[in-house]
């Protein structure tokens, strides 16, 4: 609420950087919110730098209430993508539970590793027809 009435601007831009060594509990979401996923998929189709997007749940300890975490893999600076995705996610999520959004990079450790290696993306940019043939035939 303080972010809504404060002078800082956009309440969606609250950022918290976790120090290395802090542990988080990540898990797959059994039934992701369909309307939010559909809206984010539609959005990401219009933003070329977005390669893939994932959703999982995150909590700080066993007793904590889990939050949804949206991981976005994209080329370049993704601050603006995170802002737009946050707006769409909060507008389409039933209820008003918090949503976390982070950038994921293939090959990085920590949250990025868990998400890219253990969670199936709900959005993946389509390959061009020529490249799609290569991917399907395992040529690349």
What is each residue range found by the language model?
Residues 2-119, 123:
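A contiguous, surface-oriented mixed alpha/beta subdomain in the mid-to-C-terminal portion of proteins
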Residues 126-140:
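A cross-taxonomic marker for long C-terminal extensions/tails that follow the last structured domain
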């Amino acid at each position: 609420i303080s972010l809504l009435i404060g002078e800082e601007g956009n309440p969606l831009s609250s950022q918290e950087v976790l120090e290395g060594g802090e542990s988080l509990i990540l898990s797959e979401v059994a039934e992701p919110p369909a309307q939010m996923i559909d809206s984010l998929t539609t959005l990401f189709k219009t933003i070329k730098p977005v390669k893939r997007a994932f959703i999982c749940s995150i909590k700080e300890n066993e007793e904590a209430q889990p939050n949804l975490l949206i991981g976005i893999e994209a080329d370049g600076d993704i601050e603006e993508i995170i802002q737009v995705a946050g707006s769409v996610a909060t507008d389409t999520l039933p209820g008003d539970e918090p949503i976390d959004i982070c950038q994921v990079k293939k090959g990085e450790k920590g949250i990025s590793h868990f998400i890219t290696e253990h969670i199936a993306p709900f959005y993946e940019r389509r390959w061009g027809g020529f490249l799609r043939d290569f991917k399907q035939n395992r040529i690349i």
